[in-house]
């Protein structure tokens, strides 16, 4: 497909405001699903739009299935994030603009570029299919894939494959083809301080009884030492091959050269392979509403990112034990567990990935990078659990350098889409 055709198709998709988290855009999500269904139907694939109870519309499709051939499932998602503050956008998020080799618009990189990639891969191979191809274009990834387990259970035959290519990751830098090998897991919970007293004047109780925020602050401070190292006992780390991130590049991603980082031997390992705890929110009186009272109640939500191989049940137990062991002054504190999810390891030494890296290295101008993702992709866990024998491959056309996924001024490098199409086509031919 010529670059102008890629731009035309991606632009048509970006114009559809398929924001899955906003009930006012449910019709747009339906429109987006129908657009995708028409794309693959026009290629002659067997296609359908499917919703499970409480879910958003997804598109599944497949070529004619030959039992003598390997089967590859190509995944992407057609829903997008909200746009946030429009004043921070340089262009209309749903009126795509091409500038300096990039297409700007909400969903351009995350993840409508993935749909464009898969469409063109199928189109290139259709006349002489080296493998069976199945398509799965989800409609609720941006809200955490809440019905994915039910969807897989009800549509297992439509999704089962030898290889699952998820085009919802991306490239560590512009022009650097990248394979994602790990995703961190996650547990989170709430620390709740509830001192058995009523709010009292600080002139009456101050200095005699600890207020709730003092208690909460001491617990939060116990999570890290002076070097910023996590102090929760019993957690592990994962040992995997990853490409080292430069400090200057990380600061560029963070948006400031002035921010101070923790001292660490390896930024990549710290970010992708080790546990990390953050305080997400605190409930306590607002500064503007403050009065001279000793407050009895305060709470904080904490998030613990897990190494890819860490058991989330074990991690939640270790987190709770740490909180309860570090309660100061015999205060009244409880820990309320919340969500948890496993990490993912995608072995880069398996056959399809090995062949894909060979294709990357012959088509792109730079050698392939191997990265982890510090966050989670919830549906990836469902695939790993339900299809344990399938090879999982995490790639994408987006980039972490200028892509701005989920942020204002999201964009995608157009030649990344071209080269990813070419790389996947070459790989699919070679593995047959």
What are the roles of these predicted feature ranges?
Residues 1-86, 297-301, 314:
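N-terminal helical capping/dimerization or prosegment-like subdomains
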Residues 50-53, 107-111, 370-375:
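Active-site nucleophile and cofactor-binding loops and adjacent substrate-binding regions
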Residues 69-137, 403, 415, 419:
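Active-site metal-coordination/substrate-binding segment of hydrolases
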Residues 78-79, 223, 227, 321-330:
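A common structural junction motif
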Residues 108-258, 268-275, 386, 408-419:
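Fold-level recognition of mixed alpha/beta catalytic cores in primary-metabolism enzymes, strongest
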Residues 109, 197, 304-311, 341:
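A generic structural motif
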Residues 173-174, 231-289, 293-297, 309-318, ...:
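An extended, acidic, His-containing surface patch that forms the Zn2+-binding/catalytic region
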């Amino acid at each position: 497909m010529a670059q102008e055709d890629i731009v035309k198709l991606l632009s048509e998709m970006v114009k559809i405001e398929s924001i899955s988290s906003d009930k006012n855009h449910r019709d747009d999500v339906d429109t987006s699903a129908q657009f995708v269904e028409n794309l693959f139907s026009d290629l002659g694939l067997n296609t359908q739009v499917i919703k499970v109870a409480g879910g958003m519309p997804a598109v599944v499709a497949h070529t004619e299935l030959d039992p003598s051939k390997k089967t590859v499932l190509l995944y992407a998602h057609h829903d997008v994030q909200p746009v946030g503050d429009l004043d921070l956008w340089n262009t209309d998020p749903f009126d795509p603009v091409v500038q300096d080799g990039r297409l700007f618009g909400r969903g351009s990189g995350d993840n409508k570029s993935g749909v464009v990639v898969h469409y063109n891969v199928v189109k290139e191979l259709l006349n002489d299919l080296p493998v069976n191809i199945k398509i799965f274009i989800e409609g609720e990834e941006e809200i955490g894939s809440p019905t994915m387990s039910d969807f897989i259970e009800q549509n297992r035959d439509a999704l089962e494959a030898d290889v699952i290519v998820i085009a919802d990751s991306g490239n560590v830098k512009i022009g650097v083809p990248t394979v994602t090998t790990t995703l961190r897991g996650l547990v989170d919970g709430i620390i709740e301080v509830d001192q058995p007293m009523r709010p009292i004047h600080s002139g009456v109780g101050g200095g005699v009884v600890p207020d709730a925020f003092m208690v909460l602050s001491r617990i939060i401070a116990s999570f890290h030492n002076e070097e910023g190292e996590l102090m929760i006992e019993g957690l592990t780390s994962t040992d995997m091959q990853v490409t080292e991130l430069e400090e200057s590049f990380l600061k560029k991603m963070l948006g400031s050269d002035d921010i101070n980082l923790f001292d660490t031997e390896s930024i990549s390992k710290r970010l992708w392979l080790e546990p990390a705890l953050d305080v997400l929110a605190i409930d306590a009186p607002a500064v503007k509403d403050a009065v001279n009272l000793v407050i009895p109640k305060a709470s904080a939500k904490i998030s613990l990112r897990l190494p890819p191989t860490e058991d989330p049940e074990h991690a939640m137990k270790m987190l709770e034990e740490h909180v309860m062991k570090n309660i100061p002054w015999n205060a009244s504190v409880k820990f309320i567990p919340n969500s948890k999810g496993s990490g993912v390891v995608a072995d880069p030494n398996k056959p399809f990935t090995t062949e894909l890296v060979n294709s990357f290295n012959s088509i792109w101008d730079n050698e392939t990078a191997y990265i982890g993702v510090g966050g989670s992709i919830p549906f990836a866990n469902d695939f790993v659990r339900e299809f344990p024998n399938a090879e999982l491959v995490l790639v994408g056309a987006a980039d972490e350098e200028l892509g701005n996924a989920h942020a204002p001024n999201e964009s995608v490098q157009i030649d990344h889409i071209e080269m990813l199409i070419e790389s996947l086509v070459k790989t699919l031919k070679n593995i047959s």
